[in-house]
Amino acid sequence: MPLYEGLGSGGEKTAVVIDLGEAFTKCGFAGETGPRCIIPSVIKRAGMSKPIKVVQYNINTEELYSYLKEFIHILYFRHLLVNPRDRRVVVIESVLCPSHFRETLTRVLFKYFEVPSVLLAPSHLMALLTLGINSAMVLDCGYRESLVLPIYEGIPILNCWGALPLGGKALHKELETQLLEQCTVDTGAAKGQSLPSVMGSVPEGVLEDIKVRTCFVSDLKRGLQIQAAKFNIDGNNERPTPPPNVDYPLDGEKILHVLGSIRDSVVEILFEQDNEEKSVATLILDSLLQCPIDTRKQLAENLVIIGGTSMLPGFLHRLLAEIRYLVEKPKYKKTLGTKNFRIHTPPAKANCVAWLGGAVFGALQDILGSRSISKEYYNQTGRIPDWCSLNNPPLEMMFDVGKAQPPLMKRAFSTEK
C-alpha cells in the first residue's frame, strides 16, 4: 500500500494505475512518482517452454480472459499486495486498442476482481498531464508500432493520427537477422563458429538485452552514410568507420561477438524511408499536414516523445535532426507552414511517462469518480463506452450511482451566469 496510508486513515483509498504494454507492464499507485513494478507482460504455465504473451489481439475472447485474469492476479497479489475490491483502477491504453481487448479487460476487472470503478485513459493524453500543457504532438514508440496523435486544447484530433510498424519488435527482428548472418560464437569446444550452427534462433530476452546494452542511434550525417552504403545509393557502398565490437556472454561458456557495424545499423530501420517514403520522422510531419493550419505551429513546438524504444541513446537528437532535414524537402517546405520544432523533456523516463500521467489523474479523486465507469453501471449494462462507437449512453449515466458531480464538473457544465 502507499506509504502515507496508515491503519487509521479515512477517506477513499488511492487508485491502482496499470499501464498494460505489449512488452512490459507498469503498475503502481496514484499519487506516487513512479510505478511499483515494471514486469514483462507474460505468464508462465507448466508444460510450456516459452512464456505466453498477455497482450494479444488475434486470439479468442475466452483464452484472452484466462491470460488477463492470471496476469492481473499476479499484479495485485504478488507486487501490489492490496485488495482489488477497495481501490479504483486507472488503465492506460492506446487509442487503437481493439474493442474486444478493452471489453475483455474490463470484464476481468469487474466480474472477477470486483473493482469499484475503471477509467480507460488514452496514453497520449495522459502524457500531457506530466508536463502541464494542453496541446502537443505526441509520438509513442512502443514495442509493436510507433503511433503519433496530435492533441489540441486537451482534445485528441483523431482523424490526424498515424502509425507505422516500427518499434522494438522490428528492431529485434532486424537485430536477429544481422546476428545470424554476420556474427560468430566462441564455445568451449571451438572458436569462431557461426551463430546458426550454435543456436537456430536468438531468444527474445537476449535480443532485448543486446539492444539495450550495445545499440545506439547515429547522428544524421553518419546515419545517411550508413543508409547510402546499405542501399548502394549513387554507387556509394563505403560505410563510415564502425564502433568497437562487443563480446556478449551467452549461457555457459559461449561468447557472442557482436560486430560494431551491427550496433549502429540496426536502429537505422526506424529512419529509413520505405517504398512509400515513410519513417518515424515523416510520421510526425504527415500528421501535422493533416491538422488544421492554425494549430500546426503550436503542435510543432510541443513535441512529446514517449515509449521504451525512444530511450535508445541518441534517438531524440536524431529524430529532431531528421525532422529539420525533411522539412526543407519540397513535399513539406511549401505546405507545412512552420519550421520550428521543439521536444519536451518529461519528468520521467520515456517508458513511464504515460503511467505517471495516469498516476496524476488518479490522485484527483473527485474527478476520477466522475470520469470512471462504475461497477453498478457495468453490471446494469454489461458494456463499456467506446470512442469509435456511436451507440454510447449519455455521460451522466456513467457517474457513480448516488454520487453527485464534483463542484468542478458542475461549474464546467453549468449554464448559470
Curated annotation (Swiss-Prot):
Keywords for this protein? Cytoplasm, Cytoskeleton
Q: Give a yes or no for keyword tRNA processing in this entry.
A: no
Q: Which InterPro entries match?
A: Actin, ATPase_NBD
* Gene Ontology biological-process entries: microtubule-based movement
Instruction: Give disulfide pairs as residue numbers.
Output: none
Question: Would you name any one GO CC term?
Answer: cytoplasm
Location of the protein in the cell: Cytoplasm, Cytoskeleton
What job does the chain carry out?
A: Part of the dynactin complex that activates the molecular motor dynein for ultra-processive transport along microtubules.
**Record text on subunit structure and interactions:** Subunit of dynactin, a multiprotein complex part of a tripartite complex with dynein and a adapter, such as BICDL1, BICD2 or HOOK3. The dynactin complex is built around ACTR1A/ACTB filament and consists of an actin-related filament composed of a shoulder domain, a pointed end and a barbed end. Its length is defined by its flexible shoulder domain. The soulder is composed of 2 DCTN1 subunits, 4 DCTN2 and 2 DCTN3. The 4 DCNT2 (via N-terminus) bind the ACTR1A filament and act as molecular rulers to determine the length. The pointed end is important for binding dynein-dynactin cargo adapters.
Q: Could you identify this protein by its name?
A: Actin-related protein 10
Q: State the organism named in the record.
A: Mus musculus
